[in-house]
Amino acid sequence: MEQAIINIEGTSTIEAAAAAKKLIETFGSSNIRTISVKRVNDKSDEVIVELDFVPGLAPHLHGFTLQVNGLTCGYAGTGPSNLYEVLQAAGVSEAQVAREDITQKSTKTIPLRLERAVTQYGDFQFA
């Protein structure tokens, strides 16, 4: 089954995060089944966030992935703060990932993968 990919890419971490948070709000954080954060490469602070949504949120829309590029981690700054805000909007709690996990260089939080169980009742799916 084909799956759509919505890609957010920008030169401003603030704008990329704002767009991601609005789309998460629109589709509902409770409909996210997988959250993945990975570094672009081993030497970079830049990360890619992938949010995998359940199918059926709109007619003809199978599950889809929201991919956010250009956010960063590993230092105290706007990029890591925006990454933290996107994770919070996606339903990640402070207990799961603390702000310090994102802003400190020495932590091994990234790569990060969180999954939520999905239950289906007839045509309805719940994450």
Locate each region found by the language model:
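Charged, compositionally biased non-catalytic regions
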Residues: 1-3
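Charge-dense polyanion-binding interfaces
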Residues: 95-127
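Amphipathic alpha-helical packing elements
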Residues: 10, 17, 26, 38, ...
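Generic detection of short hydrophobic beta-strand segments and adjacent strand-loop junctions
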Residues: 6, 66-68, 110
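Extended, alpha-helix-rich binding/interface surfaces that flank or overlap catalytic cores
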Residues: 5-8, 14-24, 127
